[in-house]
Amino acid sequence: MDFMQEYEKWFHSPALSPEEHAELESIKDDPKEIESRFFGPLEFGTAGLRGTMYTGLHNMNIHVIRWATQGFADVIAAEGEEGKRRGVAICMDCRNHSMEFARAAAEVCAANGIHVRIFDSLRPTPELSFAVREYGCQAGINVPASHNPKEYNGYKVYWSDGAQLPPHHADAIAKRLEEIDIFDGVKRMDFEEAVKSGLIETMGDETDRKFMANVTAMINDRETVAKVADTFKLVYTPFHGCGYKLVPEALTALGIKHLIPVPEQMVIDGNFPTVVSPNPENPEGFYLAIDLAKKNDVDFILGTDPDSDRVGIMVRNHEGEFQPVTGNQTGVLLLDYLIGAMKRSGKMPANPVALKTIVTTEMARKVAESNGVKCFDTFTGFKFMAEKKNALEESGEGKVIFSYEESYGYMLGDYVRDKDAVTASMLLTEMAAWYDAQGMTLFDALNALYEKYGWYAEKTHNLVMPGLDGLRDMAKLMKDLRENPPTEISGVKVIVRKDYTDGSVIDCVTGAKSRMELSGSNVLRYELEDGTVILVRPSGTEPKIKVYILTQGADAAASNANLEKYGQWVAALKP
């Protein structure tokens, strides 16, 4: 694609607003900036689109939203009149322009004769997954950007099971988008006109009530919560986002009496004024929550990201300071707790199964299998876990009780097929209250699990490579690792190499080649002589290579020393 030609097309298009035209005028003498915005469209994948909000083909803006929706509408229409009648559910988060983008998507769907159910205001991502399933929709559209900085927005698409789009449908949309002109190929209908004609209807409190009835049905142990409710306290922050209403509702339904919200961060604001990045993975964002917790003698802090699909926790250690609990650790804590709680309450099904991703700690497998629960791996992303859950349950092979990935996402219950911070927040709080009744904090509980199951440690390194040069550097790094694979890492021999692109496995000791069940994802895996596993993959949503170190040792010091040692090799990868 000729980026200057594309720039000129946009610059002279009457579809642009005066503000958008002025924005393009301001970069006319900056060929590098023009190239970064117009060298090609954002890639439409199974996660949809995500990018920075600027005027340009490679950015998130109303023209790209309409164009993507036209492609999606064509795929929905291919299902016939029944698919159009079942329609699409649409949701949005707190970000700047999210409501505008969601309404624009609704207008395009309506113009294509597709019935639309759109939320009246921002809602948690899991509620969109729920709505697709609850109302029998053909598809779903969400306009969030999860935990990304304020400059970002996104466009996530779902299919009829409430999970993100399967690859063959994503490919069909991508192919269709190649044929659609971004300005002239899109159908549009006025929003209010579509409402009057019955093509668009809004969802609100009634859907909230239905969703929350399913969430609260997941409570295992109200009795223990009631025993400690007069003294148990927690601090909660939604980081200016969608969790502000339903997470407190869920905790109140659980029986929590002393929920202390962070007032500054309960304010909905797409600029996220109190944090650099609204990411519960980043401890820095919890500074207000920590101050509040110390003032109120609280041991447990809970934070959900802006679209309320991911949740992070912080706990007070024995020195009285708050420390983050990683997604890997949180998942292990919750899995171990749920197994016990479900057994105690009689809720444990026959043939229970836990799901995790290939980059998630092996400690989860140890916890599951030690307690009679099978554990299966999937690729990164809840669409793959939803797919595996559906397959296991439809075949009668197993009943999934918990699915999680290390990046702070947890899926529970049968009413959603995506990560769900509302339900997870409630069950994490139930778990914290249960341990409180045993005279333990979650810091104590985590150390008890290490003593019981082994000292595992994990670290994710993000090699950020922004811009067009970054995309090239990312591709080159993956190519170099395939063409010149390491024989040792930080002085320790690589004994097995796996490439998830084609499912190939090479035994580096014997030279034997074999195949694994999983294939079709750009991930490399190195298994080392000391039991450490290192995985390398490009992020699907951000300009960075992610490197995961999964290790264990005789104790905490030994496992942390391994993280440090292998981290030096990772740091040297960045160009």
Residues covered by each model-derived region:
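Glycine-rich phosphate-binding loop plus the immediately following alpha-helix
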Residues: 158-189, 328-351, 356-365, 421, ...
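Gly/Ser/Thr-enriched, mixed-charge loops and adjacent short helices
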Residues: 33-42, 153-285, 291-293
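Conserved phosphate/anionic-ligand binding catalytic regions in large, soluble enzymes, centered on
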Residues: 38-58, 145-148, 234, 238-250, ...
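Short Gly/Thr/Asp-enriched flexible loops that form oxyanion-binding sites at enzyme active sites
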Residues: 101-109, 152-159, 309-329, 364
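Phosphate-binding and adjacent anionic-ligand microenvironments
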Residues: 294, 298-300, 321-323, 341-537, ...
